[in-house]
UniProtKB/Swiss-Prot annotation:
Species annotation: Streptococcus pyogenes serotype M18 (strain MGAS8232)
Biological classification of the source: Bacteria, Bacillati, Bacillota, Bacilli, Lactobacillales
Database matches in InterPro entries: Asxl_HARE-HTH (IPR007759), RNAP_delta_N_dom_sf (IPR038087), RpoE (IPR029757)
Protein name: Probable DNA-directed RNA polymerase subunit delta
UniProt entry keywords in alphabetical sequence: DNA-directed RNA polymerase, Nucleotidyltransferase, Transcription, Transferase
Any one GO CC term of the record: DNA-directed RNA polymerase complex
UniProt entry tagged with the keyword Lyase: no
Subunit structure: RNAP is composed of a core of 2 alpha, a beta and a beta' subunits. The core is associated with a delta subunit and one of several sigma factors.
Length: 191
């Protein structure tokens, strides 16, 4: 196989993605290729060994998917995105979705042999209309300012967060004299 695009270039310097693009461009729009056929063409053109292709195959497949110039056409066929207008791609997707919607399976209705003619029997499969209206109310956390347990839990959580940042071993012990603080608050400023 000869690709005119790469005339004068060394095949060892070409990437598999460049060769794939050139092969698809040369074949034209109506000749999409299966992935395996595309890889075989690339291998033949580049002259790579089976082991070399096996090693490069995951990278090539990733490049093929992430490169914006290629498009998967289903059934592992690949083509160039430039072959298809954006509207045409959307139309293909829409027609596929319409085909899937038309073939919905009909659900079979089960019949309970024990409920024939008995109006008082309870059918536990029926949903209770009261259940449909039920919505679980979100429990709001209320803070009671007078409850010392709330303060303790807040202090404990704050301390645990501080311990994650700075271990307790690094703290210095400081004595706090509460009487001194109260005396300072009671004093009036001197003018």
């Amino acid at each position: 196989m000869k690709l005119d695009v790469f005339a004068g270039q060394e095949k060892s310097e070409l990437s598999m993605i460049e060769v794939a693009r050139a092969i698809l461009e040369e074949r034209g729009r109506d000749n999409e290729m299966y992935f395996s056929d595309l890889v075989n063409e690339i291998q033949n053109y580049l002259g790579k060994s089976d082991a070399g292709i096996r090693h490069a195959l995951p990278f090539f497949y990733t490049d093929l998917n992430t490169d914006g110039s290629f498009i998967p056409l289903g059934e592992n066929k690949w083509g160039l995105r430039s072959w298809y207008a954006i509207d045409e791609i959307d139309e293909e997707i829409i027609t596929l979705e319409e085909d899937e919607d038309g073939a919905q399976k009909r659900k079979k209705k089960r019949v309970n042999a024990f409920m024939d003619g008995d109006e008082d029997a309870i059918d536990y499969r029926d949903d209770d209309p009261e259940d449909e209206d039920f919505t679980e109310e979100s429990a709001e956390v209320e803070y009671d300012e007078d409850d010392p347990d709330d303060e303790k839990s807040e202090v404990e959580s704050y301390d645990s967060e501080l311990n994650e940042i700075i271990p307790e071993d690094d703290f210095e012990e400081v004595d706090i004299n509460e009487e001194d603080e109260e005396d300072e608050e009671d004093e009036e400023p001197v003018l």
